[in-house]
Amino acid sequence: MPKTLHEIPRERPATPLLDRASSPAELRRLGEADLETLADELRQYLLYTVGQTGGHFGAGLGVVELTIALHYVFDTPDDRLVWDVGHQAYPHKILTERRELMGTLRQKNGLAAFPRRAESEYDTFGVGHSSTSISAALGMAIAARLQGKERKSVAVIGDGALTAGMAFEALNHASEVDADMLVILNDNDMSISHNVGGLSNYLAKILSSRTYSSMREGSKKVLSRLPGAWEIARRTEEYAKGMLVPGTLFEELGWNYIGPIDGHDLPTLVATLRNMRDMKGPQFLHVVTKKGKGFAPAELDPIGYHAITKLEAPGSAPKKTGGPKYSSVFGQWLCDMAAQDARLLGITPAMKEGSDLVAFSERYPERYFDVAIAEQHAVTLAAGMACEGMKPVVAIYSTFLQRAYDQLIHDVAVQHLDVLFAIDRAGLVGEDGPTHAGSFDISYLRCIPGMLVMTPSDEDELRKLLTTGYLFDGPAAVRYPRGSGPNHPIDPDLQPVEIGKGVVRRRGGRVALLVFGVQLAEAMKVAESLDATVVDMRFVKPLDEALVRELAGSHELLVTIEENAVMGGAGSAVGEFLASEGLEVPLLQLGLPDYYVEHAKPSEMLAECGLDAAGIEKAVRQRLDRQ
């Protein structure tokens, strides 16, 4: 059994076996008797490195044994191993020639937080969003068949990610094409079955054995010649297995289901994977693990230890600065508005903690809906609720709303339904990198007819604009970033603002800075040195055209500032209006560049994009010098 630790090591632990397994090839030279000791060392090293850098935590601890077994049995990187989401991939990185680089994890120019093709040949598919692994591994399996290659394709997916429709679409397609691939369900929530133990492990070994597989294939060849006989035999086998193991659903989808087995029992994992490696057709292995395994605090609080920040030296922990988190402001607003309006319903696609819906879910459980990882369903669910006079609020990360774009247009906007989208994590998100950045929501929202799109500049503005969007008759979106605000006083009243009207925060001379969002604070820092007018635009759509027209007539340069892609963003909206009016004032658009900004600290990313105070001032002065 894995050893259980109670503290994160502050000193690098001794790992003599792990030092001999820097690559899967070296790992495969170890004896099976060494693997359990290797697992203990890998878990200690993982605790140490994540303690130094911060990062996703519990999921990786839970798949230490599974990761070792996969690389021990399969010929990676020639065999294709695809991790879903990637939260659990740190042990994989350690075993695939990146152990000594783990100290750079999630840092600028360091290792990415998720598997990434450009980083290693062992990262066969770049991930970050959930439920993509089975589709990707199926594509690889089909390619191998067409290329005449014998390589294996393996997808590892969690029980949460398996709830998404895309995963079931891939399962269905794989059975249709009879793909030679293996899907491993990493069930770390016990949401599918508690049926784990000696009997399940024994059955898994039997059902995955060469003898059983040969008998099954031989019987299939004989019985397939007899009309109806093979179908009767198949159903009999399925019924017998279904009485003992909970795989009927997957068997119905055309998969050979094995499990559930203990995902921390290395001998069973290795034996079962060896048996399944050479089995033909779609194979499904159900493995039960414990999130946070081997670290007592994480086992007791798997949600709280999903990710951690880096350890600070004793007595040196930084004091909290700034205001409340934007997500907390949203969570409080949701509860306050719900107290006033019984029609309000809260919807989240598996982001209760991240979007700060915990208090709402506890106060109004009958009005709270966590639809799991099902963004498309979340949006159309809200549309159906709105059809019946309810007031749904969809709390969703910007990067995940992309997954429901058709539903946003077809099911909500075309019907002009009254749905409010509270779009969290808008803009750059720091160490999680480009897969989690909300770089495009202004661009993909402002082109939708009838959509109200708002960009608050601080905590108080967020509360006001949420109220404005909630009271608006039609689809509305409020985008706000990860992290804390500037500690602006918050008006407790639920008061809306006038739609389509910006606010001039400072009057200046030659330059007008038109700010869409939280960069207002950075713009104010340089306003005096630039003698600039500073405007909190508030609304991307409808744009405050009267204000833009007035600013164009009284300034030599207009500068738009947004934490969104420049292409198609708020600056583009201003440029389109100026062109339509024949206003020839120069326009400088500052925002995210036309490339994916790699993971780093948020301050480093903003500096790279020229969206901090220094970058804004530099860009404006360079433009003025050319005029």
From Swiss-Prot:
Its EC number is 2.2.1.7. Keywords: Isoprene biosynthesis, Magnesium, Metal-binding, Thiamine biosynthesis, Thiamine pyrophosphate, Transferase. One of its GO terms (molecular function) is thiamine pyrophosphate binding. GO terms for cellular component: cytosol. Thiamine diphosphate binds at H87, G128, H129, S130, G160, A161, N188, F295, E375. Binds 1 Mg(2+) ion per subunit. Its cofactor is Mg(2+); thiamine diphosphate. Mg(2+) binds at D159, N188. GO terms for biological process: 1-deoxy-D-xylulose 5-phosphate biosynthetic process; isopentenyl diphosphate biosynthetic process, methylerythritol 4-phosphate pathway; terpenoid biosynthetic process; thiamine biosynthetic process. It holds the Pfam family DXP_synthase_N. CDD domains: TPP_DXS, TPP_PYR_DXS_TK_like. It comes from the Bacteria. Pathway: Metabolic intermediate biosynthesis; 1-deoxy-D-xylulose 5-phosphate biosynthesis; 1-deoxy-D-xylulose 5-phosphate from D-glyceraldehyde 3-phosphate and pyruvate: step 1/1. InterPro entries: Dxylulose-5-P_synthase, THDP-binding, Transketo_C/PFOR_II, Transketolase-like_Pyr-bd, Transketolase_BS, Transketolase_C. SMART domains: Transket_pyr. Belongs to the transketolase family. DXPS subfamily. Homodimer. This is 1-deoxy-D-xylulose-5-phosphate synthase. It comes from Pseudomonas aeruginosa (strain LESB58).
